[in-house]
Amino acid sequence: MAAASAGNGRGGVSLCLATAGGVKALALSAFTLAWTHSIAKVEWQEDWRVTPAGLELVQARVKGTGPGMEPPPEARLVDGWFQWQPTRSPMPEVVLGNSAAAGEWRLCHGGQCRTLSEIVGHPIGANVTKMGFCKDP
């Protein structure tokens, strides 16, 4: 994913969000992706790191269980959340589908959460959003 400089001036990594309306670069190296399950209405959160190798899933947690969304056996209950550390290689990109039934994906960083529509500056709608490490244009 290529985008204009995120303007961080630190020579660090950036997260790119690609939507039907363009690409938005965010100067951050870690974030939490949060959403509500469309049927069970249960909150999910994933902590991610942005690396040149791709997006690395560091920790996942869910606030309850439901059909088809059981936490894995290694999950531990901490403050009402089932938490675990997935073991998977960094991914070049993560594709997020959108559903009006579930509400929007929220990206959290620095103590604030915003919807993807708020971040990119236009409604995402039913289109997919791709997340990945920003490469130099």
Label the predicted regions:
Residues 1-2, 55:
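N-terminal short leaders/motifs
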Residues 2-3, 86:
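Surface-exposed peri-terminal alpha-helical interaction modules
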Residues 5-16:
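Extracellular secretome segments
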Residues 14-71:
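N-terminal secretory signal peptides
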Residues 71-137:
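Mature, soluble, non-transmembrane domains
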